[in-house]
């Protein structure tokens, strides 16, 4: 798919292990999982539309005064 083979994936995993350490990996994985879940939820929810009525007459009266 991305042209990343098993060897490249293994090298990346070893580098992440060296940089962050074994104790931080579950924490990083959990944070990444939450981020992906929130992104999917935000992408699937419809956009919120503000339907609050505004009184245009009052605004025009304020401008004339």
Swiss-Prot record:
Keywords: Cell inner membrane, Cell membrane, Membrane, Protein transport, Translocation, Transmembrane, Transmembrane helix, Transport
Gene Ontology terms describing biological process: protein transport by the Tat complex
InterPro entries recorded: TatA/B/E (IPR003369), TatA/E (IPR006312)
Record-level Gene Ontology MF annotations: protein transmembrane transporter activity
Predominant localisation class: membrane
Protein location: Cell inner membrane
GO cellular component terms attached to this protein's record: TAT protein transport complex
Annotated TM spans: 1-21
Protein's membrane topology: Single-pass membrane protein
Function: Part of the twin-arginine translocation (Tat) system that transports large folded proteins containing a characteristic twin-arginine motif in their signal peptide across membranes. TatA could form the protein-conducting channel of the Tat system.
PANTHER family linked: SEC-INDEPENDENT PROTEIN TRANSLOCASE PROTEIN TATA
Family per similarity comment: Belongs to the TatA/E family.
Subunit structure of this chain's protein: The Tat system comprises two distinct complexes: a TatABC complex, containing multiple copies of TatA, TatB and TatC subunits, and a separate TatA complex, containing only TatA subunits. Substrates initially bind to the TatABC complex, which probably triggers association of the separate TatA complex to form the active translocon.
Protein name (record): Sec-independent protein translocase protein TatA
Originating gene: tatA
